[in-house]
Amino acid sequence: METTTELSHSRLLGTYSYPTSHRVIEIVSIAVFAVFYAVFGLRAVAAVGDDLDVATVGLTVLAAFLALVLADFLSGMVHALCDNLGSVDTPVVGQKFIRSFREHHTDPLDMTRGDFVRVNADNFLVCLPILIPCVLWLNVGSNPFVSTFLVVLMAFVVVTNQIHKWAHTDQVPGPVQWLQARRIVLSPDHHRVHHTPPYDSHYCITSGVTNPLLTKVGFWPVLLRFCRWAGRFLGGSPATGSSQGPGA
């Protein structure tokens, strides 16, 4: 996600507030992902259909559940690291990733004003190094468990920022409310904990399903101690309470 003050308008590229070159990369990333994901998804469906029995269905459901759990955990890891390690000046990731998370805590509602491309394109982009080899070179599409796991994992990864946006949006579509109520995707009430002092837990933003367990086992304090230690070498400073902004 990018934030600046001047808006650019284009019939082809939409409305955006950052360099046109970045906008083009974002749109191309989404388009490339859509093509390769469709191919991989069809292979996954075929793999499940070719050996459809009770065991296959059970493994498929298990794969989907594990994929959701992993996607949620990964979202929390990325979120926590970007909140607490490095700075906007960190090479490679500073401007593209860390900046978005830091600015989100200054103005949590900024992402609700962004369009689909601005909010989600980064996640489409980071999936391509996994998706493209799976389609072109790796024979994982023929395995029902592995293919289902990857299809569901990438689906949740690419929509994580959209889910996060919904958690900050007052009015969302009925189906989204249904998913939020059943904790399939992140709910506003659950996410509000992260925007409440001391701002040091509930980093997972896909469904939030892993937050209670990670909090109970004391995972976040350990990770934050690591960030403070690593920060001595990598530079930067964590987001502080005064920069966390208003609640969810």
Give the positions of each predicted feature.
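Core segments of transmembrane alpha-helices
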Residues: 29-37, 118-136
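Short, hydrophobic transmembrane alpha-helix segments
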Residues: 39-56
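Membrane-helix interface/capping segments
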Residues: 76-110
